[in-house]
C-alpha cells in the first residue's frame, strides 16, 4: 500500500521548511500489513505555530496537545513530537512537553504495533526495535503495560479491539496486566467504553473480543449482568452449551451490523434470573421480557442513543417470536410490533440463535414467518391506522363528535382491515362504521 499523494505533499512541505516529518501510528501498521489505512497521522518537530503558516487550510482543534489537522484533499493530523507528563485523569496527560526526537515520541505510544514510523519515501523507522511484533502478530505494550494502563485504562479495551481487528494475539505480559488492572476501566467514561465495545462487536472476530473481555475480567465492570451467564448450565436438550458460550456463538453467527450484534450479546442476559428446573429440564419463562428490561438498563448505562436502544430492546424482546403460530392478522401485528426497519435484524438474530443451539437446526418457522412478512410488505397491505382509507375527518362527516373515542374507533377499524384488507375503502369502512361503531 503506497502513501497517498496528499500525505506526501504535506510531509514534503514540512521537510522543505526544515522540519522532520514521519508517517506514524496505525497508518504505518496497516500499510505494513497490506491494509488500507482509514486515516493518516504525521509526526514532526514543528510546533503547531510553525505548521499553520505552511498550509492554507488548517483546523487548530487539538492545538493544546500539539495537534492540528491539515486539509489537503483529505484531513491529515500533524502532531508535534512530544513527551507526556503524568496522567491524572486516566485519559490525558497533566502536561505535554514538545520534543525534537522521534524516539521520545514513539515511547509514549500505547502498543508496539503503533510505535513505528515511515518517511515519505516509504523507509521504515523503528527507534524502539519493535517491528518484530508486527510479524509475530503480537499486541504488546510499549514499556511497562501496568504504567500504560494506569495512564489510560481504555487501552485495555483497545488491546482487545486490535486483536479482533487484526487477528493478532495479546502478549502474556500485556494480557495479565489487563487482568490485574481491569478495575481501572471503571474510571473511563461510558461513552468511550461504548465506542470501543462497538468496534469490538463490528470487528471480523467479535467472538474473540467477547471471550477476551470475559477472561480478562473487563466484562464484569462493563456489563456485569453477563457474569451470571458464564458457565450457567441450561439443563436443556435444545442447548449443548452454557448460557455465555451460547451467547458468544450467537454473536459469531450474526451479520456485521451493530444492532443485531448488540442484541445477540444481550438476548439471553436474563436466563439466569428466570431459570426454573422442572423434572430435570431447564426453563426460562419470560426471559425475553425480563431481558428487554435488562438490555435497556445496560444500553442506557453505556450511553447508546435512543434509536439504537429502542431497536436492540425490540430484538431482545421478540427473539422468541418464531415459535408462535400466527394467523395473517397476527403477522401484521408482529410487523407493527417489531417495526419494518428491524425485521431483517430480527430474522438474522433468530437464525443465529438456532445455529448456536444444539442440532438439529430447524429454520422452518423463522423462514416461513419471514416469507409471510415479505409477502405482506410486497403487497403493501395496510398495517397501521395511517394506512386506512379514512381518517378523523371522515368520521366527523359520518356524524361522530371529535374526541378521544375517535382514535379508538380507528383502531377498531384497523382490526377489521388487518383481518380483511379488502374492506379498506372509504365505502367499505363506512359500512363497518354504520354497522356498529357509532
Where are the predicted features?
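Catalytic cores of the polymerase beta-like nucleotidyltransferase superfamily
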Residues: 1-438
Amino acid at each position: 500500500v503506497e502513501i497517498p499523494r496528499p500525505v506526501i505533499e504535506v510531509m514534503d512541505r514540512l521537510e522543505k521548511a526544515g522540519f522532520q516529518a514521519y508517517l506514524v501510528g496505525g497508518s504505518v501498521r496497516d500499510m505494513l500489513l497490506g491494509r488500507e489505512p482509514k486515516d493518516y497521522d504525521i509526526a514532526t518537530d514543528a510546533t503547531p505555530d510553525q505548521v499553520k503558516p505552511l498550509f492554507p487550510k488548517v483546523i487548530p482543534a487539538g492545538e493544546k496537545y500539539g495537534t492540528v489537522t491539515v486539509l489537503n484533499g483529505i484531513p491529515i493530523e500533524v502532531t508535534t513530537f512530544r513527551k507526556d507528563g503524568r496522567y491524572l485523569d486516566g485519559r490525558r496527560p497533566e502536561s505535554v512537553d514538545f520534543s525534537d526526537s522521534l524516539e521520545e515520541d514513539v515511547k509514549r505510544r500505547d502498543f508496539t504495533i503503533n510505535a513505528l514510523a515511515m518517511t515519505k519515501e516509504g523507509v521504515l523507522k523503528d527507534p524502539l526495535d519493535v517491528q518484530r511484533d508486527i510479524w509475530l502478530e503480537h499486541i504488546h505494550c510499549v514499556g511497562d503495560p501496568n504504567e500504560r494502563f494506569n495512564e489510560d485504562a481504555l487501552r485495555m479495551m483497545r488491546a482487545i479491539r486490535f486483536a479482533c481487528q487484526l487477528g493478532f494475539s495479546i502478549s502474556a505480559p500485556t494480557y495479565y496486566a489487563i487482568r490485574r488492572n481491569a478495575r481501572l476501566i471503571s474510571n473511563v467514561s461510558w461513552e468511550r467504553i461504548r465506542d470501543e465495545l462497538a468496534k469490538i462487536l463490528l470487528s471480523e472476530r467479535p467472538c474473540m473480543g467477547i471471550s477476551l473481555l470475559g477472561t480478562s475480567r473487563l466484562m464484569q465492570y462493563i456489563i456485569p449482568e453477563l457474569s451470571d451467564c458464564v458457565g450457567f448450565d441450561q439443563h436443556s436438550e435444545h442447548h449443548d452449551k452454557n448460557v455465555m458460550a451460547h451467547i458468544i456463538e450467537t454473536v459469531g453467527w450474526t451479520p456485521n451490523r451493530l444492532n443485531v450484534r448488540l442484541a445477540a450479546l444481550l438476548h439471553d442476559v436474563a436466563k439466569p434470573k428466570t431459570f426454573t428446573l422442572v423434572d430435570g429440564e431447564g426453563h426460562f419463562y419470560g426471559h425475553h421480557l425480563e431481558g428487554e428490561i435488562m438490555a435497556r438498563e445496560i444500553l442506557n448505562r453505556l450511553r447508546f442513543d435512543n434509536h439504537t436502544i429502542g431497536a436492540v430492546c425490540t430484538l431482545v424482546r421478540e427473539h422468541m417470536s418464531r415459535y408462535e403460530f400466527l394467523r395473517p392478522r397476527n403477522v401484521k401485528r408482529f410487523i407493527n410490533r417489531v417495526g419494518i426497519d428491524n425485521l431483517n435484524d430480527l430474522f438474522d438474530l433468530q437464525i443465529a440463535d438456532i445455529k448456536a443451539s444444539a442440532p438439529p437446526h430447524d429454520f422452518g418457522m423463522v423462514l416461513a414467518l419471514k416469507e409471510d412478512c415479505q409477502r405482506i410488505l410486497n403487497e403493501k397491505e395496510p398495517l397501521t391506522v395511517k394506512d386506512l382509507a379514512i381518517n378523523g375527518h371522515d368520521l366527523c362527516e359520518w356524524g361522530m363528535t371529535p374526541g378521544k373515542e375517535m382514535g379508538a374507533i380507528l383502531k377498531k377499524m384497523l382490526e377489521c382491515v388487518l383481518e380483511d384488507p379488502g374492506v379498506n375503502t372509504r365505502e367499505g369502512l363506512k359500512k363497518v362504521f354504520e354497522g356498529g361503531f357509532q
